[in-house]
């Protein structure tokens, strides 16, 4: 009995440390999200360079990455301390799209990245199918 009480207490302490760490990470991500918002506004309104459209698109994708990580942390707390798999898949798809936008010089690499996105979309479909849903 005493061993199980200690295990429960240790699990609760570790869960509290994890929650504090995730809240700190969420705060940092919100700060970066605000910083990226100002950067996007600057690129959109002030910059008139030729490369500004690429910077704008890359900035938007980075913005969505920050947003998805924050949504993942929110969902973690809402779902009883559980990270849903589909949010990680969304983040992976967005990160690969950003990679294609930033580094599209090699057609073979772009094809491999596109195949990876297709694989992630199929994985997302399977993860959301009724066979793999939790009850």
From Swiss-Prot:
Name of the molecule in the record: Protein PsiE homolog
Keyword Flavoprotein assigned: no
Organism superkingdom: Bacteria
Transmembrane segments: 14-34, 54-74, 82-102, 107-127
InterPro entries: P_starv_induced_PsiE, P_starv_induced_PsiE-like
Keyword hit for DNA-binding: no
Subcellular location: Cell inner membrane
Family: Belongs to the PsiE family.
GO cellular component: plasma membrane
Single biological process term from Gene Ontology: cellular response to phosphate starvation
Keyword annotations of the record: Cell inner membrane, Cell membrane, Membrane, Transmembrane, Transmembrane helix
Membrane topology summary: Multi-pass membrane protein
Annotated organism of origin: Pectobacterium atrosepticum (strain SCRI 1043 / ATCC BAA-672)
Gene: psiE
A Pfam family that the UniProt record links to this protein: PsiE
């Amino acid at each position: 009995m005493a061993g199980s009480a200690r295990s429960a207490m240790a699990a609760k302490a570790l869960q509290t440390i994890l929650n504090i760490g995730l809240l700190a990470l969420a705060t940092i991500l919100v700060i970066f999200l605000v910083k990226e918002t100002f950067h996007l506004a600057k690129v959109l309104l002030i910059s008139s360079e030729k490369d500004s459209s690429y910077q704008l698109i890359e900035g938007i994708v980075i913005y969505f990455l920050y947003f998805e990580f924050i949504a993942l942390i929110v969902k973690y707390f809402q779902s009883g301390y559980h990270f849903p798999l589909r949010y990680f898949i969304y983040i992976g798809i967005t990160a690969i799209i950003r990679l294609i936008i930033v580094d599209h010089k090699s057609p073979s690499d772009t094809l491999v990245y596109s195949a990876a996105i297709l694989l992630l979309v199929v994985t997302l479909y399977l993860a959301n199918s009724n066979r793999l849903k939790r009850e």
